[in-house]
Amino acid sequence: MGVGVTQSEPITAMRAVIKVEAAEVVDSKFRDRKERAQKQFATDLKVISGAGERDGETFSEWFSFLASGEIGSKTKTGQLLTAALGEDAKAETLEELASKLVGKTFAAQIGTSKDGQYSRVIHDTIAPTPPEAAKGDDT
C-alpha cells in the first residue's frame, strides 16, 4: 500500500461485504434514551467488496449496547452479531463475544456519519454475507 496521506473522503457503498479486522469492548461516553450506561464494540472493519476502488480499505465503527450486556436483536449491534455469527451470537463474556467477531464477515450498506465525515454501517441493512461473496474473501 505504501505511505502517505490516507483517503479523506468517507467510504460509501450501497451493498458491501465487510470483514471485522478487530473488535474490543469499551465504555461508551453516551447513554441510551433512558439514561442507562452503555458499552460498545469498537471495531476496525475492512471492505472486502462492493465499494469499487475503495475495496480493501478499513474504517472504524462502534456498535453500542447496554452496559448490562443486553443486546436486542433489532438493534444495530444485534443485527451485526446475528449476521456475522449466526446461531453462535452468544458467549460467557462481552470480551469473548468481541473476539468471536474478529475474522467474520457480513453485508451492509456503508453510509456516512451525521456530519458526513466518517464511514458508518447503516442500521437495518446488515445481513449475513451472501455465499457467493464469501468465496471471494481470500484475505
Regions found by a protein language model. Name each.
Residues 1-139:
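Short beta-rich binding modules
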